[in-house]
């Protein structure tokens, strides 16, 4: 999994304290994106599922957000990291740059969807930006 960064004890990427995993790679290139450095998958550091789980489980009470970039861009690698032994009690949230209707057409993305608790879908649309909306652009 190509990871840009991991932030522990954040409250910006979902409700409550979370561990946020910022995945590299996003083909959307939304105008006004707040994280354009995430677009290129090569900007991340290759991280094994075991390493990722050690980071997630270093705070077993924190929920988890997969952001980016677009975590669904690496959907094939992520399911093993979402429901690992010990992580069952954590809420797993994914921020996704496409619409749900597109996600269910891709078998790898659909498998990841089955493993998570919350999906925030849709591309960032600068004209609709509202700073009063939580966890959205």
Spans of features found by a protein language model:
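Classical nucleotidyltransferase
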Residues: 105, 113, 118-137
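Conserved Radical SAM active-site core
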Residues: 1, 17, 35-112
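Surface-exposed, flexible loop/turn segments at secondary-structure boundaries
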Residues: 11, 100, 127
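Short secondary-structure boundary/capping segments
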Residues: 11, 56, 110, 132-135
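N-terminal pre-triad scaffold of radical SAM enzymes
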Residues: 2-29
């Amino acid at each position: 999994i190509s990871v840009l960064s991991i932030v522990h004890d954040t409250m910006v990427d979902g409700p409550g304290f979370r561990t946020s995993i910022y995945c590299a790679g996003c083909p959307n290139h939304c105008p006004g994106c707040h994280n354009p450095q995430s677009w290129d998958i090569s900007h991340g550091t290759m991280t094994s599922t075991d390493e990722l789980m050690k980071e997630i489980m270093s705070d077993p009470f924190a929920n988890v957000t997969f952001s980016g970039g677009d975590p669904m861009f690496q959907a094939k690698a992520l399911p093993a990291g979402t429901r690992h032994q010990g992580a069952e009690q954590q809420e797993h949230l994914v921020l996704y740059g496409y619409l749900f209707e597109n996600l269910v057409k891709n078998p790898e993305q659909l498998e990841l969807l089955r493993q998570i608790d919350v999906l925030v879908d849709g591309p960032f649309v600068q004209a609709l930006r509202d700073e009063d909306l939580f966890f959205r652009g």
